[in-house]
């Protein structure tokens, strides 16, 4: 009976797939002309390869905790890129943009929605096709 939990643990570790945090998804924006850390999880010692549509390839080997990271260097601004992360499985990030990344943080006013604005209908109709927003699901960071 003592061997069953160990067997289950080993089964989970051996069948681990490459995973990425939610921030790395389709429509991702990376800072142009710089090194961008990209990380995730995989089975310990599994080779993880990251290939970009702009011709760069990186590889990493997760430690005993399954964590891995590479620093992907980006070209000048552009859109329509793709990033493929491969280990025992494959994840393809589509419609990746390279450009300027702005991080906005603050107090409660950072959660102000367009619907609460003075001219909400007018603001909602603004066409900004190159503008992408990522909002963290976490509301409190303390």
Model-found features: residue ranges?
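Accessible peptide chain termini
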Residues: 1-2, 142
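Sec-dependent N-terminal signal peptides
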Residues: 3-13
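Cell-envelope and extracellular/periplasmic
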Residues: 17-142
């Amino acid at each position: 009976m003592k061997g069953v939990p160990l067997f289950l643990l080993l089964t989970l570790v051996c069948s681990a797939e490459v995973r990425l945090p939610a921030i790395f998804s389709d429509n991702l924006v990376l800072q142009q002309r710089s090194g961008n850390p990209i990380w995730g999880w995989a089975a310990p010692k599994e080779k993880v390869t990251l290939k970009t549509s702009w011709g760069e390839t990186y590889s990493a080997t997760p430690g005993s905790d399954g964590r891995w990271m590479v620093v992907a260097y980006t070209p000048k601004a552009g859109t329509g890129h793709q990033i493929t992360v491969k280990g025992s499985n494959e994840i393809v990030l589509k419609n990746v943009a390279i450009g300027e990344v702005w991080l906005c943080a603050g107090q409660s006013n950072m959660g102000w929605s367009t619907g609460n604005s003075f001219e909400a209908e007018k603001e909602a109709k603004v066409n900004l096709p190159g503008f992408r927003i990522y909002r963290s699901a976490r509301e409190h960071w303390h």
